[in-house]
Amino acid sequence: MTITAAMVKELRELTGAGVMACKKALVETDGDQEAAIEILRKKGEATAVKKSGRIAAEGVVFTAVKDGKAAIVEVNSETDFVAKNEKFQTFVSNVANQILDSDAADMDAFMAEPWALDTTKTVKDELVSQIAVIGENMNIRRFKKIESDGVLASYIHAGGKLVY
């Protein structure tokens, strides 16, 4: 089967993977998009394992407040360049919003929860996917959730940049 640019573009939009990685996956699967997605997912897991030994000391703190609940989360990356990246920021925002609806008592329980935006994945699976797309080691370092009948508000100094 001939792999067209449109097929590569569609797979790239679905996965966020690079052009050549998408093309290779489509060639390997003879144009089967679902099989190509699975190959890219497995490749992303391998990439995440390789990157997991690298230090992720940069990152951001993000808060979410809704219906008497507030969550704060710290997500780390290797560089401040990635910490400022729109995809990274969106991921961190989604993590904070998921924490609002989570009953997880600790990080292990949270990482095992279904990802709210795609329940076929866990939070850990989505983190691995983001590592593959962004290309740096990342980790959800810590989070805290509070509930109150009073007023909850949020303020993050310095745009959420980590300062030690």
Spans of features found by a protein language model:
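N-terminal assembly/interaction segments in proteins that build large macromolecular machines
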Residues: T2-Y164
